[in-house]
From Swiss-Prot:
Gene Ontology cellular component terms for the protein in this record: membrane raft; plasma membrane
Keyword Protein biosynthesis annotated: no
Organism for this UniProt entry: Bacteroides thetaiotaomicron (strain ATCC 29148 / DSM 2079 / JCM 5827 / CCUG 10774 / NCTC 10582 / VPI-5482 / E50)
Name used for this protein in its record: Flotillin-like protein FloA
Subcellular location(s) per record: Cell membrane; Membrane raft
Entry membrane topology: Single-pass membrane protein
């Protein structure tokens, strides 16, 4: 009695679990949607996708979209292989459909290669149809007259599908355009000619073929704004003048130091000579005493020498100016 009571409950629970597992591993409604859309795929293939960890809700909608767009050569195996390789199936299918509608030549192999290279293949197709405008950051350059100019440009580019794999990106385009603007302004004779004809910059930059080796084709380069910056030439001249002044001051200080050193050296030599004179004068009394003892100097000779010294001292005193600004007058006889 109890077994017959629990049996329906077990069957119901088991049936619910079976249906959950069935619809999880076998997406019946997705298979039905594919059949209605004309995509040939079986329930066994959907079940095997689950076993291979390939989500059917990504592969089947892509197959339906490609089939509706007339791209019937795209197979389920190709989409599965691209997903397992780490690609974006939805973006690849969207890109192929957009390229087909826009008459852009794009194969499935090329689209998957672009996607696996890290590029947004759908955005690339959109850029091929609708060119993209890139605003450059302010580019600073100096004309030959020393005036600094700050320019901003707008670069219109179109994606080159064939160059997306291995081609340089937007940063390279911006760097090359900035280099071209700097070169064009730097070769101008003065800043006025640049302000009068800003299109000359665009023409010169376009002639350089800056899009070589990139994933884009440059359609146009337009100078959006040009501002006048600093007078770099005048600033450099001022800096040079200050440097020359500092050099001259340093040389003058060096000469002054040498002159002071030379003066001190001469004073030292004078002190040395004075010391020698004093030393020699100290020897005079000794020599006179020796002359007296040897009889070479008489008393009259000694007094005559003293008179000469006194006369010399008197003449020196007369020749010296007084503190009041007048000279000493000679004594009246």
């Amino acid at each position: 009695m109890e077994t017959s009571l629990y049996l329906p409950i077990v069957l119901i629970v088991g049936g619910i679990i079976f249906l959950i597992l069935f619809f999880h591993y076998v997406p019946f409604f997705l298979w039905l949607s594919a059949k209605v859309s004309g995509v040939n795929i079986s329930l066994i293939q959907l079940f095997l996708m689950r076993i291979r960890n390939v989500p059917p809700y990504i592969i089947v909608p892509g197959m339906i979209e490609a089939h509706k767009a007339g791209l019937k050569n795209i197979t389920r195996d190709e989409l599965e292989a691209h997903y397992l390789a780490g690609g974006h199936v939805e973006k690849v299918v969207h890109a192929l459909v957009s390229a087909s509608k826009a008459n852009i030549e794009l194969s499935f192999q090329m689209a998957t290669a672009i996607d696996l290279a890290g590029r947004d293949v759908f955005e690339a197709v959109q850029m091929s149809v609708n060119p993209k405008v890139i605003d450059t950051p302010p580019v600073t350059a100096v004309a030959k007259d020393g005036i600094q100019l700050i320019a901003k440009a707008r670069v219109t580019v179109r994606a080159s599908i064939k160059q997306l794999v291995g081609g340089a990106g937007e940063d390279t385009i911006l760097a090359r355009v900035g280099e071209g603007i700097v070169s064009s302004i730097g070769s101008s004779e003065n800043h006025k000619s640049v302000l009068e004809n800003p299109d000359s910059i665009s023409k010169l930059v376009l002639r350089k073929g800056l899009d070589a080796g990139t994933a884009f084709e440059i359609l146009s380069i337009d100078i959006a704004d040009i501002d006048i910056g600093k007078n770099i030439g005048a600033a450099l001249q001022i800096d040079q003048a200050n440097a020359d002044k500092n050099i001259a001051q340093a040389k003058a200080e060096e000469r002054r130091a040498m002159a002071v050193a030379s003066e001190q050296e001469m004073k030292a030599k004078a002190q040395e000579a004075r010391a020698k004179v004093i030393e020699a004068e100290a020897e005079v009394p000794k020599a006179m005493a020796e002359a007296f003892r040897s009889g070479n100097l008489g008393i009259m000779d000694y007094y005559r020498m003293k008179n000469i010294e006194a006369d010399t001292s008197m003449r020196e005193n007369i020749a010296k100016p007084t503190t009041g600004g007048t000279t000493n007058q000679p004594l009246s006889k």
